[in-house]
């Protein structure tokens, strides 16, 4: 008997629900057909994966083992198309990047220009998206590299062992607001501690900056009298709304540095509310083509010289 990879999805559905009927509905098939597929998987393995005597159906010891192995197998299979492309394009000079929107506009262009003096670069393909989507592109080997904000205390969506990274720059999340006629912030964070409601502009769940901010400052923000007047996944959108005077937003200093210098935005809280950030370049640990490996080596050299000039 040959194993059908879709049986893993059947197993996962039943393991999650413990109910054959509900799992069959999730897999869009009749219960008898679903039960036959689970039985076929067990026959292929030579062991029972579920204790059918219990209600709901309970995963057996072998089933718990298979749950872990199956997850690893699915991750491995999902990565195969990207790895196949990597082998096929080993001699290609094209570099494929995924970068968050904020860094695509601010950090990436001058950083690439500086690296061009150290490495010969061919064409570059850039995908600009929210960090969650960028992580997915790297995990699926759709890109060679991902550039994103990071913080040492906040886990990214990528496993450190499988996705090594370099700190290639720094930034800072700064709470900012449009100024009033006297040059003072229209929306002050400390105002939320005195009973006044502070209007906030927030990041959505897909945002890497939002992930960092919620992890490090979320509890303190929740203690304030506040109201979110707008939520978005792009820092550039929050910047536009902040410039319009709608509320206070934590924005990357690389994005709003010119606004702060020209007085279009002002810092709206004390230094304790600011968050120092790393800018990290991520890659998959498996070997890429010569062009990508050459670029990684140049980035490593540049980073080492930046820390030890």
Where would I find each of the regions flagged by the language model?
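Acidic, Gly/Pro-rich loop/turn segments at junctions of secondary structure
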Residues: 129-198
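Central regulatory/effector-binding core of bacterial HTH transcription factors
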Residues: 92-155
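Secondary-structure junction motif
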Residues: 182-186, 190-191, 196-221, 306
């Amino acid at each position: 008997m040959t194993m059908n990879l879709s049986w893993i999805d059947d197993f996962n559905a039943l393991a999650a629900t413990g109910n054959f009927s509900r799992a069959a509905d999730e897999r869009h098939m009749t219960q008898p057909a679903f039960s036959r597929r689970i039985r076929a998987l067990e026959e292929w393995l030579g062991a029972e994966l579920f204790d059918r005597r219990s209600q709901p159906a309970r995963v057996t010891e072998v089933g718990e083992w298979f749950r872990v192995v199956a997850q690893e197998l699915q991750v491995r299979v999902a990565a195969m198309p990207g790895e196949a492309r990597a082998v096929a394009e080993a001699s290609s000079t094209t570099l494929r990047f995924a970068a968050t929107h904020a860094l695509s506009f601010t950090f990436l262009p001058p950083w690439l220009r500086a690296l061009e003096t150290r490495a010969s670069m061919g064409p570059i393909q850039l995908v600009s998206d929210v960090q969650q989507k960028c992580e997915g592109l790297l995990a699926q080997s759709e890109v060679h590299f991902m550039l994103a904000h990071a913080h040492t205390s906040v886990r990214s969506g990528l496993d450190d062992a499988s996705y090594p990274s370099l700190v290639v720059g720094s930034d800072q999340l700064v709470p900012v607001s449009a100024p009033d006629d006297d040059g003072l912030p229209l929306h002050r964070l400390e105002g939320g501690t005195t009973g006044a409601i502070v209007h906030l502009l927030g990041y959505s769940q897909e945002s890497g900056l939002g992930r960092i901010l919620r992890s490090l400052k979320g509890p303190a923000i929740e203690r304030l009298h506040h109201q979110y007047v707008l939520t978005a996944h792009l820092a550039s959108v929050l910047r536009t709304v902040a410039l319009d005077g709608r509320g206070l937003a934590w924005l990357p200093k690389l994005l709003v540095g010119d606004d702060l210098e020209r007085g279009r935005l002002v810092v709206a809280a004390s230094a304790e509310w600011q968050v120092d950030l790393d800018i990290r370049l991520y890659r998959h640990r498996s070997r890429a083509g010569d062009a990508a490996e050459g670029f990684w080596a140049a980035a490593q050299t540049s980073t080492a010289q930046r820390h030890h000039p």
